[in-house]
């Protein structure tokens, strides 16, 4: 895991397996089925990295030989909240890692001015819960900012929110940092820039279309 000095709340997950799978996802000739499988796999690997600092306590358990105080996650409950629609493809990988997590959904689409328009919010109970927001792309950053806004408006502490994406553009990361400097943003790659259509370059195309086999 590494950081970029420009963005204090950005964490780049540079594990070799993550980078290997991301390269195959970028390939325009990768099939929908393979893209979907890779997204699930890479999200599981990223989930392992982002949860390494969860608080730990101990629980008394009895093994076949003795009783011991064994480590368990302390108190906090976990929720996975994909940003629709492409974020849905990331939730399965996280659920493979954390099968007991609750799942919410935040639905937004990008208007002509690239601003997010909310059409759905469904969340589990908020008390004492850590939220993992996920969306494959942070392009303009507006949808990511909006998703965090949804939680903060419901009094979820910033310390209980993290955002996970595959690729991000510096422009979007700056927007996210300006709005939510207290929320950690985890990505597999910080790419070069946004083009005139607000697509990430080099990016991986439209993640939703590639995930579901649709055309924009």
From Swiss-Prot:
Binds 1 Mg(2+) ion per subunit. The magnesium is bound as Mg-PRPP. Its cofactor is Mg(2+). InterPro entries: PRibTrfase_dom, PRTase-like, Upp_B, UPRTase/APRTase, Ura_phspho_trans. This is Uracil phosphoribosyltransferase. 5-phospho-alpha-D-ribose 1-diphosphate binds at residues 85, 110, 135-143, 206. It comes from Burkholderia multivorans (strain ATCC 17616 / 249). The lineage of its organism: Bacteria, Pseudomonadati, Pseudomonadota, Betaproteobacteria, Burkholderiales. It is an enzyme of class 2 (transferase). Its EC number is 2.4.2.9. GO terms for biological process: UMP salvage; uracil salvage. Uracil binds at residues 200, 205-207. Belongs to the UPRTase family. Keywords: Allosteric enzyme, Glycosyltransferase, GTP-binding, Magnesium, Nucleotide-binding, Transferase. Catalyzes the conversion of uracil and 5-phospho-alpha-D-ribose 1-diphosphate (PRPP) to UMP and diphosphate. It catalyses: UMP + diphosphate = 5-phospho-alpha-D-ribose 1-diphosphate + uracil. Allosterically activated by GTP. One of its GO terms (molecular function) is GTP binding. Pathway: Pyrimidine metabolism; UMP biosynthesis via salvage pathway; UMP from uracil: step 1/1.
């Amino acid at each position: 895991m590494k950081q970029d000095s420009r963005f204090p709340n950005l964490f780049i997950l540079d594990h070799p397996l993550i980078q290997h799978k991301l390269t195959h996802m970028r390939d325009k000739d990768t099939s929908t089925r393979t893209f979907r499988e890779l997204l699930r796999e890479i999200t599981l690997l990223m989930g392992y990295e982002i949860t390494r600092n969860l608080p730990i306590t101990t629980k008394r358990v009895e093994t076949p030989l003795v009783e011991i105080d064994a480590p368990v996650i302390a108190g906090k409950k976990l929720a996975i909240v994909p940003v629709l629609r492409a974020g849905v493809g990331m939730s399965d990988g996280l659920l493979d890692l954390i099968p007991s997590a609750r799942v919410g959904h935040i639905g937004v689409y990008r208007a002509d001015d690239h601003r997010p328009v909310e059409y759905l919010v469904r969340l589990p109970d908020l008390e004492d819960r850590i939220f993992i927001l996920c969306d494959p792309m942070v392009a303009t950053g507006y949808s990511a900012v909006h998703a965090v806004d949804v939680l903060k408006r419901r009094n979820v502490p910033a310390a209980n929110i993290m955002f996970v994406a595959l690729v991000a553009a510096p422009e979007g990361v700056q927007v996210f940092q300006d709005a939510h400097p207290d929320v950690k943003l985890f990505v597999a790659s910080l790419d070069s820039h946004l083009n005139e259509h607000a697509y990430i370059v080099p990016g991986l195309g439209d993640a939703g279309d590639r995930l579901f086999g649709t055309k924009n």
